[in-house]
Amino acid sequence: MFDLKEKLRTLPEKPGVYMMRNDKNEIIYVGKAISLKNRVRQYFQSSKNHPPKVKAMVSHIVTFEYIVTDTELEALILECNLIKENRPKYNVLLRDDKTYPYIKITTNEEYPRILKTRKVIKDKAKYFGPYTNIGALNETLDVIHTIYPIRTCNKNIERMIANKERPCLNYHIKKCIGPCTGLVTKEEYHQMIHDIILFLDGKEDELVRKIEEKMKAAAISMDFENAARYRDQIIALNNIVEKQKIVSVAEQDQDVIAMAKNEGNTWIQVFFIRKGKLVQREHFILKDTEDDSNQEIIASFLKQFYSGATFVPKEILIEESVEDLNVLEEWLSGKRGNKVSIKVPQKGDKKELLDMVKKNALMTMEQATTVIQLEKEKTEDTLIELAQLLDLEEVPYRIESYDISNIQGVESVGSMVVFEGGKSKNKDYRRFKIKTVKGPNDYASLEEIITRRFKRGLEETQDIIEQSLEVSEGKFAIFPDLIMVDGGFGQVTSVKKALHSLNLNIPVCGMIKDDRHRTKGLVYEGEELSIEKTSHLFRLITKIQDEVHRFAITYHRSLRKKTTLQSILEEIPGVGEARRKALMIHFGSIDKIKNATVEELLEVQGMNRKVAENIVEYLNK
């Protein structure tokens, strides 16, 4: 039994990190403290001065844990890692890192590639980002590939050269320099990668000077073809440099951070200044921050943003000072490798620069808020139209859609997607493996997954009532206002049969397609309803139908791929269950295993040379 008084009494007066847990043993808050004893006790003293958010959090605390650290810096690093890993409900959170893309240069490969990724891992590759503007990221990648035709494939270049394999189409249309031909040296290829890194580091001026020297040397030696290529590269780079605004005469690297608050959310604007030029800007949204002070918001942003950032500048400008500023500077200096200063300018050029970022933060917030409001009004009108079409008593705020996917009855799966207020709610999506139905029977499969979903929901609802829990704490406890199934009258009948067996009365309609497998309309209460194809309602139905189909197909493919991989690897001598699992964990896909060299395979846990050679020989027959 958890004894709160005893645990509070024995808290150490040392720096560390504390984790608050609820009755499900979930971490709902992570914090750091100079003195764990003083900080943690504050939560359980008189709540008069606590803001509503803290009061709500404390009401859910069932137990807490703490980790003692030697220094405040260690506590800060641990806090950042725990917040990133657990994403606690009551911490100020940036959107999940996985949703922000990065540019990745695979410098861990002999012939590196440049990729777009949403995951930063310790694999000796070089990362740039995060980017919140996908359009700007894609434009950057287009420019890079235009100037530097590096490879985009994941083929084994050394093997292609050794076997004299034919290069792909990209080589013939001059979109790839073709390292697989053996006509390009590693030094030449790596020089291109070095130039790309200079470009992404914001050192375009230095890069242009280097290319100008190459152009002059090529012209002197009468290599006019390469001289022309270098000239085109310089023109492309100068076009980018001209777009960059000079904001500081001092050629230094700075990040300038300002914020704007509205309707419980905080909009953060970051200007990235490199060598005195504004090279990029990004904005971020922190939700549900109405009870958090500006200092708390800024501190949380700095910790989370720079935990995932691939570059830390020498100077960071912010609007208000934050608690533990010195510790933050020490942490960032460690990440950068030399001194980093966090400053709050009060006057002069730096204050003017911060004011400019503040204006942009306000403008971005106002524009986005207007768009969100217009979108909300349009969606509300669309849902009202749907309610009128189906003669529903209530506007269907929450819609659940279901689909079955199988190929000749093999690996049948069901999927459930959720839309709330006309927008997909990905965290409520669910997948079901069909357990009781043999062979291709969509009707029986639908009946099974609907029964399982709502039976589980009823059980959770009972637990919530008995234990006085919040409805949101159940995975299936929230029921829809409308069910939309991918299919016609037969599918609708199966769903209604399952609901009837559980004494549930939820409206059900089917989304039907035409002969070309495109959205056609709805079926409801035995009647087929046509919808104007140019209407917002038609677009919403199409969106829901496409999404539930995509989700089902994706799940089905992943299961098939695992089965295929398993069967292929099972046939290779020396590859048992443990090695199959180790290969999958290390490489992630059959394609990557197929393209791996013997040396790369030897990096897999439990692998020996003979088995590695068997794998290469078998997969490349």
Swiss-Prot record:
CDD domains: GIY-YIG_UvrC_Cho. Pfam families: GIY-YIG, HHH_2, UVR, UvrC_RNaseH, UvrC_RNaseH_dom. GO terms for molecular function: DNA binding; excinuclease ABC activity. InterPro entries: DisA/LigA_HHH, GIY-YIG_endonuc, GIY-YIG_endonuc_sf, GIY-YIG_UvrC_Cho, Hlx-hairpin-Hlx_DNA-bd_motif, RuvA_2-like, UVR_dom, UVR_dom_sf. It comes from the Bacteria. Transmembrane segments: none annotated. Residues 13-92 form the GIY-YIG domain. Residues 205-240 form the UVR domain. One of its GO terms (biological process) is SOS response. Its main location: cytoplasm. Keywords: Cytoplasm, DNA damage, DNA excision, DNA repair, Excision nuclease, SOS response. One of its GO terms (cellular component) is excinuclease repair complex. It is found in: Cytoplasm. SMART domains: GIYc, HhH1. The UvrABC repair system catalyzes the recognition and processing of DNA lesions. UvrC both incises the 5' and 3' sides of the lesion. The N-terminal half is responsible for the 3' incision and the C-terminal half is responsible for the 5' incision. NCBIfam families: PRK00558.1-5, uvrC. PANTHER family: UVRABC SYSTEM PROTEIN C (PTHR30562:SF1), UVRC/OXIDOREDUCTASE (PTHR30562). Interacts with UvrB in an incision complex. Belongs to the UvrC family. This is UvrABC system protein C. It comes from Alkaliphilus oremlandii (strain OhILAs).
